[in-house]
Structure formats: C-alpha cells, structure tokens
Amino acid sequence: LVDTLPDITWCLNQVLLEQGCPALTAETVRGYIGGGVTAMIERVATQFGIADAVALHQRYVTLYQNNLVQFSRPFSGVLALLEGCRQLQVPLAIVTNKTEEMARQVADALLPQNTFGTILGHRAGRALKPEPEVAWEAAQRLSVDPQRCLFVGDTEIDLKTARAAGMYSAAVTWGYGLTPTLQAQAPNFCCEQPAGLLRILQQVCGTAHVFTDHGDTVKSY
C-alpha cells in the first residue's frame, strides 16, 4: 500500500552513522525488509558486527516513530485501487509486522479514512507473520470466512501467511519482494500493478465460486 522504504532507509542510516558505520543504499535495505523490525535490525547488526543489537533496535524504533511519513507515500495506483474496493464494497484489513501503532499512524496519514475495517500489527502476545493467527483474526473482525479471503502481499512471508491461513494469495510485484522469489511461493495470482489486483476483485465479486475459476495455474495481471 505505502512505500515506506525511504523512511526506513533514512532512519536506519542515521542509526548506522551514529555507530560509525557506512550508510546503506535503499536497495540493500529493501533486501532486509520482511519478518519485522527485530529481524531487520538483527541482519544489519550481523553485517556490521554490532554487538548490542537491542540498543540498535531501540534507537531505530525511537527515530522511526518520529519520522514515519517524512518521505513515505502510497505506491502509484494504490489510491485508485482503494477507491475501486470501496465501490465494490470489499471489506479490507491491514495485516503487518510493523507495530500496530505505527501501522495505524501511517494509514491515518497517507490513506483514505474509514477504508479498513481493521488494522492489525505486531503487539505483545500476537505472533508475527507467517504465523496464521493474525490473518484469522483479521478475517474474524471483518466477519469473513478465511477461505473466502484474498491475502495480498509483496514478500514471501505474506504468501506463506496466506497458505498457512488457508486463504487465497496474490503476490504484488510493485513492492519489496523479488518477482522470482514471490513466484516460487506459487501464489494464486501475481499482479504487476494495482489495477491488475482491482481487475481480480471486479471479476470475482458477486460470484458464487469465488476465485476457483483460476484452477491451479497462477494468473498474472
């Protein structure tokens, strides 16, 4: 939905510069995204031999909380996608490994109000993706059968979550994941642009069979 890489990169580089480490390119940071902030910081700490990953994590989180939407913007085409979903009356939820508070702040700042029925992020006692519980919780809050849900994501962790939760999956290649990596997870759909995802929803909304017309072949949009 939102390209948060610029703010993540900026904050991470500020923390690294404080440690006397060189700055990372956005493309390098892109490869570290997935699995939550703790996993990202652990990868960075390992790369630079930083012993106190906990302190690094705390400093990064503090900085990022104050710079959530300095450079972040919705991906091109996302606002039109959300408007299309509104017209189709598709119930939507956000499921993220960001902290729930951060996810809500980003959505409130950059996405249309009242778009999402629920926003679920990381918090104490809630397992991160790819564990399926958070996806099931989202479906429950939307009053939708998980087997009728389409779980959309740009990382292999998202697609593993969909599989674990028994949901249909759509890989989107405009985000952070590499297309071959996403395709290796055999998603039900693969979308290069938000408009492609909207076409999927337009095709299946109001039909009784719900997604089953695609068979076992990945459809690209």
What are these regions (language model features)?
Residues C21-P22, I50, P112, V144:
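Helix N-cap/coil-helix junction residues
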Residues N66-I94, E100-Q105, P132:
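Short, acidic loop-to-helix structural element flanking the phosphoryl-transfer center
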Residues V15-L16, G36-I50, V106, A138-A139:
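Helix-loop "lid/cap" segments that line or gate small-molecule binding pockets
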Residues L1-G31, Q47:
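Active-site neighborhood of HAD-like aspartate-dependent phosphohydrolases
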Residues I8-T9, A26, V37-I41, A53, ...:
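A general structural signal for well-ordered alpha-helical segments in protein cores
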Residues R43-A80:
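Metal-dependent phosphoesterase signature
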Residues R86, T99-E100, R104-Y221:
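Asp-based, Mg2+/Mn2+-dependent phosphohydrolase catalytic module
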